[in-house]
């Protein structure tokens, strides 16, 4: 089979103005970035369009194909003459050159041109990086200018959209008095910046400015918080973001319109594309497909409990993506023989799928359809077992082959999703906003993850008191934990239950408007692997790229 980039190069793409016309947009409404991408103005009016959330079972090192499935479903609906639009995240540049690769889908279900998307795209990440680092420069300048704010402990870090472990812990101001005040600092990857989360939850430019102003960046000598508004640069930060706040219009290989906008991490942030892009898509299309990062206990929970509240939206249907391979992995199959038939491992691992169905259907009250991403090594016996298991739970299953066949490989899924969208929809939230922070965390850990007990370590207990003092108990919670398990232990596979869930610390994100519960080591600046993907990339004399995936 051809590589992803070879498939892209063999596909004749439409001019972005032709793609825009499918959404009722004319060329005057586009800010063109070449032939195949454009920015559009936000449209935020209430809409009766159908929103479809794509989520997954717990991810494995192999990948479950969530973005590929989202694209395949959109192409299938497009082929059925439905007015459809995708609303997806922008990929981070760092992982493209590391081990993960890009985030444009795969096979014949891709966004294109994939090299445009995976590299600089329309410059949103660069604008976010500059905005983040302007705040850092303002902090260090305040220190240099005799520290009028009495800054004592700095929380804010610089950022860069690249995997570079050497920048995690650094010192700055080493050149003497004229070159700044010496201090310890560090870099996060841009996707981990609070500016990214703020941009993706903002509902307008004025809301963005208010959120930026409210970002807590330091504590003073009296242990009181210092905010961006105290630095006086919230307008300057938003000037850098005035174009980045506009959604980007793109297309799939089958020319389905796609809004690609924002890309916050799915652990320390909510892991969804921007509220503005999602609401704009809902104003332009009858069916909108979006996704949430990692498995449903992380990404979908944050989508439903955080994003849906902020945006005042709700899904009409939820697609739960899984693979036979991932279910066998969760059943502790031999990793060296994971592609071979193993009904014992599948029967054990399918409880992971059951746990996600229980949450989405039973807890959140969603209309769920399972999308089984089929591989060539899957057997009929294995596929039929998954179907029968889901049918007993009242869930329909579509076997999907869109990686190989494009939209026509997801037609069964499209039909099931259309049927699900015709049902009444609602959201049963995990917690009430009036609950205090501790109660909110306990409800997510016990009701969604399956924890038997929640333990707060000393640092977290101190932050709980601070949250009360700052009157921030009304904020939603965003739990940062491993994506590989329902629990906070990556090795606890399947459907873990009754475990002790440990909260190590709390990160107060006043700009984004949520409290991050830190439940394990969080990687905010990835490193490159032993053999980075960068070494396999080539570009010829005509500028044609190869080796990008």
Swiss-Prot record:
Pathway: One-carbon metabolism; tetrahydrofolate interconversion. One of its GO terms (molecular function) is ATP binding. It catalyses: (6S)-5,6,7,8-tetrahydrofolate + formate + ATP = (6R)-10-formyltetrahydrofolate + ADP + phosphate. One of its GO terms (biological process) is tetrahydrofolate interconversion. InterPro entries: Formate_THF_ligase (IPR000559), Formate_THF_ligase_CS (IPR020628), P-loop_NTPase (IPR027417). ATP binds at residues 60-67. Gene3D superfamilies: Domain 2, N(10)-formyltetrahydrofolate synthetase, Formyltetrahydrofolate synthetase, domain 3, P-loop containing nucleotide triphosphate hydrolases. Keywords: ATP-binding, Ligase, Nucleotide-binding, One-carbon metabolism. SUPFAM superfamilies: P-loop containing nucleoside triphosphate hydrolases. It is an enzyme of class 6 (ligase). It comes from the Bacteria. Its EC number is 6.3.4.3. Belongs to the formate--tetrahydrofolate ligase family. This is Formate--tetrahydrofolate ligase. It comes from Campylobacter concisus (strain 13826). The gene is fhs.
């Amino acid at each position: 089979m051809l590589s992803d980039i070879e498939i892209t190069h063999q596909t004749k793409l439409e001019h972005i103005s032709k793609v825009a016309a499918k959404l009722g947009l004319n060329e005057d409404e586009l800010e063109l970035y070449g032939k195949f991408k454009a920015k559009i103005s936000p449209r935020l009016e209430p809409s009766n369009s159908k929103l479809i959330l794509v989520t997954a079972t717990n991810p494995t090192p192999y990948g479950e194909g969530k973005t590929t499935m989202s694209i395949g479903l959109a192409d299938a609906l497009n082929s059925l003459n439905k007015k459809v639009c995708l609303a997806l995240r922008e990929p981070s540049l760092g992982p493209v050159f590391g081990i993960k690769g890009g985030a444009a889908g795969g096979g014949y279900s891709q966004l294109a041109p994939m090299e445009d998307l995976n590299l600089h795209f329309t410059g949103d990440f660069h604008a976010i990086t500059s905005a983040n680092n302007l705040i850092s420069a303002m902090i260090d300048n305040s220190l240099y200018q005799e520290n009028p704010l009495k800054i004592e402990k700095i929380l804010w870090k610089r950022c860069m959209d690249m995997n570079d472990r050497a920048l995690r812990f650094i010192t700055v101001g080493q050149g003497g008095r004229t070159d700044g005040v010496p201090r310890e600092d560090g870099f996060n990857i841009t996707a981990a910046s609070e500016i990214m989360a703020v941009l993706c939850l903002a509902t307008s430019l004025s809301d963005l400015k208010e959120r930026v102003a409210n970002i807590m960046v330091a504590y003073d000598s009296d242990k009181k918080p210092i905010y961006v508004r105290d630095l006086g640069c919230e307008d300057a930060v938003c000037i850098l973001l005035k174009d980045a706040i506009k959604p980007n219009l793109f297309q799939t290989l089958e020319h389905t319109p796609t809004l690609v906008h924002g890309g916050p991490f799915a652990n320390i942030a909510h892991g969804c594309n921007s509220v503005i892009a999602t609401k704009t898509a809902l104003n332009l299309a009858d069916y909108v497909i979006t996704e949430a990062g990692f498995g449903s206990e992380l990404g979908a929970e944050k989508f439903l409990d955080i994003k849906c509240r902020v945006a005042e939206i709700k899904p009409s249907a939820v697609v739960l993506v899984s693979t036979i391979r991932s279910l066998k992995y969760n059943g502790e199959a031999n990793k060296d023989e994971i592609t071979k038939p193993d009904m014992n491992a599948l029967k054990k691992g399918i409880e992971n799928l059951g746990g996600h169905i229980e949450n989405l259907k039973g807890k959140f009250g969603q209309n769920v359809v399972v999308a089984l991403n089929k591989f060539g090594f899957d057997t009929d016996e294995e596929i039929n077992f998954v179907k029968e298991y889901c049918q007993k739970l009242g869930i329909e299953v579509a076997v999907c082959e869109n990686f190989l066949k494009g939209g026509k490989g997801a037609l069964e899924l499209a039909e099931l999703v259309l049927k699900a969208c015709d049902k009444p929809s609602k959201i049963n939230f995990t917690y009430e906003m009036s609950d205090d922070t501790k109660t909110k965390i306990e409800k997510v850990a016990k009701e969604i993850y399956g924890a038997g007990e929640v333990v707060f370590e000393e640092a977290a207990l101190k932050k709980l008191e601070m949250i009360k003092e700052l009157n921030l108990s009304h904020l939603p919670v965003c739990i940062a934990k491993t994506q590989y398990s329902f629990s906070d232990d990556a090795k606890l596979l399947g459907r873990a239950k009754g475990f002790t869930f440990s909260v190590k610390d709390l990160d107060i994100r006043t700009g984004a408007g949520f409290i991050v519960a830190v439940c394990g080591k969080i990687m905010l600046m990835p490193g490159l692997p032993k053999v980075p993907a960068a070494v396999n990339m080539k570009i010829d004399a005509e500028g044609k790229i190869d080796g990008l995936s």
